[in-house]
From Swiss-Prot:
Keywords recorded for this protein, A-Z: ATP-binding, Ligase, Nucleotide-binding, Protein biosynthesis
PROSITE patterns assigned to the protein according to its UniProt record, in alphabetical order: GATB
Name assigned to this protein: Aspartyl/glutamyl-tRNA(Asn/Gln) amidotransferase subunit B
Subunit structure: Heterotrimer of A, B and C subunits.
PANTHER family: GLUTAMYL-TRNA GLN AMIDOTRANSFERASE SUBUNIT B MITOCHONDRIAL AND PROKARYOTIC PET112-RELATED, GLUTAMYL-TRNA(GLN) AMIDOTRANSFERASE SUBUNIT B, MITOCHONDRIAL
UniProt record similarity statement: Belongs to the GatB/GatE family. GatB subfamily.
SMART domains: GatB_Yqey
Task of the protein: Allows the formation of correctly charged Asn-tRNA(Asn) or Gln-tRNA(Gln) through the transamidation of misacylated Asp-tRNA(Asn) or Glu-tRNA(Gln) in organisms which lack either or both of asparaginyl-tRNA or glutaminyl-tRNA synthetases. The reaction takes place in the presence of glutamine and ATP through an activated phospho-Asp-tRNA(Asn) or phospho-Glu-tRNA(Gln).
One Pfam family from the record: GatB_Yqey
Lineage: Bacteria, Bacillati, Bacillota, Bacilli, Lactobacillales
Biological process annotations from GO: glutaminyl-tRNAGln biosynthesis via transamidation; translation
Source organism of this protein record: Pediococcus pentosaceus (strain ATCC 25745 / CCUG 21536 / LMG 10740 / 183-1w)
Length: 475
């Protein structure tokens, strides 16, 4: 029996704002517990929240980036539940009027493109964080309480673990380019919950879904879905029924593990938030947000190809992350050759980042230093071989122009300086001259090697070859 897989993804993205969604408390990652809180975050009676306009505009940007319709009149709702990290006993969210609806993202898997629909996206506040120690004590940190989130809910269009992975990559890329979030799973600014069900091929009725929670990387999302897909298939092939469960992915075993069985839909008793006014978004506000929108990856790729002469592949690689794309643009703005800059970013720079296991912003590399190095290669101040040493220097924060001069690595390109050396070497190697006359090309390589040896590798190979051939042909 063949089966069809249906996957839905709920992605929570922490918005990069200076203050929280309904209170003036700052938003900072890694501060001391409960350092960034106030009476609104603690849920004191009688205190009134106030909506952060920047959060609403970030939600509008996300909607635009994901081709969604912006809801013109919105209100907030209370989602009622009790948990220690939620002192108010409710979460403020958008149950009935999400900020964006009916969007889509294009993905590509194995050369095939597909649009994945986005059902809705809504802004809401995050909860605090519980921690437990071996002595039996539990602690609550409310620094995260009230941090603004946008939850993005996909339509059931994803049909394989690979498509889920591609969707998450595309979503992260587009949100990152808006600048509204760092979208870093390791810091908790992007979190993913997964729903998966299977049904016999040809059946219109969805199967019973399982939910996977607390997955901390895109790769583990893909692996968890692949395992869960096979687990559910085995159950159905054996004549059993899939139970509605919440499961987690175990990285050590590569399996999903039962957390709890869902007995029924939870009743959160939603009702409109009485302490917050509704929000009306008019055409002027939308236009203002559109004017603030940064250039999206697709437009950047097209510009790199049309204006800078890059290949489609180069443009695609450079726009995988906003960080790399911005670094490329800043380097080219310094006068560096676009193609050579792209080659270094995709080659040496990426290799360095992977080797050091760091992001670009965590290194000592700067667009100014990379541009100086690229320009020295272009104007033949240094050779490509010398550039390897220069690149290592700029990863350590060295200014390349002064470093090259201090190390005596400036390439010799002046014919007036090189010609006497070349003539002397040719005069001292009569056998090589004879070999050249007899059609032995290796003789040229030998003579070039002698010249490079005498100049300690600093002679410009192009100039050397030109003068050498002129000298050999004249004899």
């Amino acid at each position: 029996m063949n089966f069809k897989t249906t996957i839905g993804l709920e992605v929570h993205i922490e918005l990069k704002t200076n203050s929280k969604i309904f209170s003036p408390s700052p938003v900072e990652f890694g501060d001391q517990p409960n350092a960034n809180t106030n009476v609104i975050d603690w849920g004191y009676p009688g205190v009134l929240p106030q909506t952060n306009k920047g959060v609403v505009e970030a939600g509008m940007m996300a909607a635009k980036a994901l081709h969604a319709n912006i809801t013109r009149t919105q209100h907030f709702d209370r989602k009622n539940y009790f948990y220690p990290d939620n002192p108010k006993a409710y979460q403020v969210t958008q149950a009935d009027t999400p900020i964006g609806t009916d969007g889509w993202i294009e993905i590509e898997v194995e050369g095939k493109k597909k649009k994945v629909g986005i059902a809705e996206m809504h802004i809401e506040e995050d909860a605090g964080k519980n921690s437990h120690n071996p002595n039996g004590y539990s602690y609550v940190d409310l620094n995260r309480q009230g941090t603004p989130l946008i939850e993005i809910v996909s339509k059931p269009d994803i049909e394989s673990p690979d498509e889920a992975y591609a969707y998450l990559e595309a979503l992260r890329q587009r949100i990152q380019f808006t600048g509204i979030s760092d979208v870093k799973m390791e810091e908790g600014s992007m979190r993913v919950d997964v729903n998966i069900s299977i049904r016999p091929l040809g059946s219109e009725k969805f199967g019973t879904k399982a939910e996977l929670k607390n997955i901390n990387s895109f790769n583990f999302v893909r692996k968890g879905l692949a395992f869960e897909e096979k687990r559910q298939q085995k159950i159905l092939l054996a004549g059993g029924q899939v139970r509605p469960e919440t499961r987690r992915y175990d990285e050590a075993t590569g399996q999903t593990i039962l957390m709890r069985v869902k007995e029924g839909a939870e009743d959160y008793r939603y009702f409109p938030e009485p302490d917050l006014p509704s929000i009306t978004i008019d055409d002027e506000w939308i236009k203002d947000v559109e004017d603030k929108m940064p250039e999206m990856p697709g437009k950047r790729r097209a510009r790199y190809v049309e204006e800078l002469g890059l290949t489609d592949y180069d443009a695609m690689v450079l726009t995988q992350t906003k960080e790399m794309s911005d670094f490329f643009e800043a380097t080219v703005a310094q006068g560096a050759d676009p193609k050579l800059t792209a080659n270094y970013l995709m080659g040496d720079v990426n290799a360095y980042l992977n080797d050091q296991k760091v992001d670009l912003q965590e290194t000592k590399l700067t667009p100014e230093h990379l541009a100086s190095m690229v320009k020295m290669i272009t104007d033949e101040t240094i050779s490509s071989k010398m550039a390897k040493k220069v690149f290592k220097a700029i990863t350590q924060g060295e200014e390349p122009t002064s470093w090259v001069k201090a190390k005596g690595l400036v390439q010799l390109s002046d014919p007036a300086v090189l010609k006497p050396m070349i003539v002397e070497i040719v005069d001292n190697n009569e056998q090589s001259v004879a070999d050249f006359k007899n059609g032995k090309d290796r003789a040229v390589g030998f003579l070039v090697g002698q010249i490079m040896k005498q100049t300690k590798g600093q002679a410009n190979p192009k100039v050397v070859n030109k003068i050498l051939m002129q000298e050999l042909n004249s004899r």
